[in-house]
Amino acid sequence: EYLIVDGYNIINAWSSLSAFKEKSYEHAREKLIELLSSYQGYKGIKIIIVFDAHLVKGGLEKRYSEGPLEIIYSREGETADAVIERLVYQLADNAVVTVATSDWEEQRIILGKGAYRISARELWNDLVLVQEKIRVSYSKSELNYQPNSVGERISFKQREIMEELRRRK
């Protein structure tokens, strides 16, 4: 299963990331990658984030991995939308593909190519829900952790003696 994310569309739609982009787009991109990395870990899906670089003179398409995520920058003259459409075309026959974008035109195109769509708001809501589930799960695991139990502090011989005493009752 794949989630393809229209990077700048999501950054511009999420107010928490928009604040970062005012300082630097690089910082906003890093924060998006960080958020989606934990989301990917919980969901167990392959996430590809696509960023526009079509205005970069002489720019070639760049692909690299950032932890479990794949990051793609479009080449000069090619929009992120075009890269997303190409990926959907390549992947949709053999896998479930969902595209995260609030671009209405892009949603129509990817739906026509056999992919699902999720808006920026829907992705944000799911991300918040996943973060809460991770937090609750972590809290529960901390509550169940019992360091320094008696069994961990005594020798094997002492455990045998105590077990024998317990059985005599």
Region spans (language model):
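Nuclease catalytic cores that cleave nucleic-acid phosphodiester bonds
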Residues: E1-L3, N9-K169
